[in-house]
Design a protein with these regions (language model features):
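N-terminal "mature head" segments of proteins
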Residues: 1-115, 138
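Acidic, serine/threonine- and glycine-rich low-complexity intrinsically disordered segments
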Residues: 158-276, 280-281
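Repeated scaffold domains used in trafficking and secretory/extracellular systems
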Residues: 43-53, 78-91, 114-127, 152-164, ...
Length: 354
């Protein structure tokens, strides 16, 4: 009789503990990321359309073709080229190794101007540069191609970064120079050091010109982050890398300036300036492109004809990857959209959490 009376009590106690566990201990299921295809277009001799007012325009460069497309999947410009080309969302130019006085055009194929020099044009958004023959000098141009100022050096330029107000260049001897875009004056000249064989393999400068991040050296290669104090750069963070990268690599400040990403052999590092935290994420292949939006950082890495897109959340965690085979590829972002170019196609995916 006593046993029968105790059974309901056991059931009640078990139910209470189960309910308390559900309330206090159970964690909600993680949200899954959904990739929704919006459209896919061919860039093989496409029909050319006009962009509507306010329609977002982006560039593509796949193999020996380049051009512009819109967020709604319209190709508005398509060019093939036998030799060399430079392109940004604002300008493009087709040229060869002997080119002089190089014409360049807007994203609507309208003549923009002529770069009054011989060399290799380089566009970053609406900024225009030309690297001069020899690889140790460059010029900054205005919107018509006229030379504004020129840096003439004797050491090979091994890394380069440009923002609206400042330009930074890294050199084979391990030095970094920062130039004022308005005047061309050299404001900073320093060497991160710390390695047996100094060379700057990758760098980026923050939009306000206050921070410079770089990967430098061989034999004890390291990543450094420096901050401008008056007319000097002070290293505020550094870490030695566990492997040496034998090639030029990417360093990238995020748009909000709070994080900087750097790629080296076998990994990507993410340094959070606000949290003073350095996170390492294994990425086996060389990263060739970094794009971002408000929620994610997308990285495109390459090993021969195998491309991998890695998605990093703003908590510096790798949320997922996917791979594909191609001879050439690119990625681009706009809001929640991810654009993937592959050989002769471009796809738009909407990325969301469910």
């Amino acid at each position: 009789m006593k046993l029968k009376r105790l059974i309901p009590l056991y059931i009640i106690v078990t139910f209470i503990f189960t309910l308390m566990y559900i309330i206090f201990a159970a964690k909600p299921l993680a949200k899954e990321y959904q990739f929704t295809p919006i459209w896919k277009i061919s860039t093989a001799n496409p029909a050319i359309s006009e962009a509507e007012d306010g329609e977002k325009i982006m560039n593509f460069h796949l193999g020996q073709t380049l051009g512009y497309f819109t967020e709604n999947g319209k190709v508005i410009l398509y060019k093939t080229f036998p030799d060399r080309a430079a392109i940004s969302n604002s300008y493009y130019a087709l040229y060869d190794s002997q080119a002089n006085n190089i014409p360049f055009y807007t994203n609507k194929a309208e003549p923009a101007g002529t770069i009054e020099a011989s060399g290799y044009p380089f566009f970053i958004d609406n900024l225009i540069y030309i690297f001069l023959p020899g690889g140790s000098s460059f010029s900054k141009c205005d919107e018509s191609g006229k030379i504004l100022w020129t840096y003439e050096g004797i050491l090979p330029i091994t890394a380069f970064s440009a923002k609206e107000k400042y330009t930074a260049a890294g050199f084979a001897d391990g030095t970094i120079k920062v130039f004022n875009n308005a005047s061309g004056s050299e404001e900073i000249n320093f060497a991160p050091g710390g390695s047996d064989y100094p060379v700057i393999l990758g760098l980026d400068i923050s939009a306000d010109g206050q921070y410079v991040a770089a990967i430098s050296g061989h034999n004890q290669q390291r990543f450094t982050l420096s901050h401008r104090e008056e007319n000097q750069q002070k290293i505020i963070f550094h870490t030695f890398l566990n492997s040496d990268t034998p090639y030029r690599t990417l360093v990238h400040f995020c748009k909000n300036g709070n994080r900087v990403l750097y790629n080296y052999k076998g990994a990507v590092g993410i340094y959070d300036l606000k949290e003073d935290k350095n996170t390492i994420i294994p990425i086996k292949d060389k990263v060739i492109s970094i794009e971002e939006n408000d929620n994610f950082v997308y990285m495109l890495s390459k090993n021969k004809t195998n491309y991998t897109v890695s998605i990093i959340e703003k908590t510096d965690t790798l949320e997922g990857t996917f791979s594909f085979e191609a001879d050439s590829a690119f990625i681009s972002t706009d809001g929640e959209n991810l654009y993937i170019g592959k050989d002769n196609t471009i796809s738009r995916l909407s990325v969301s959490q469910e």
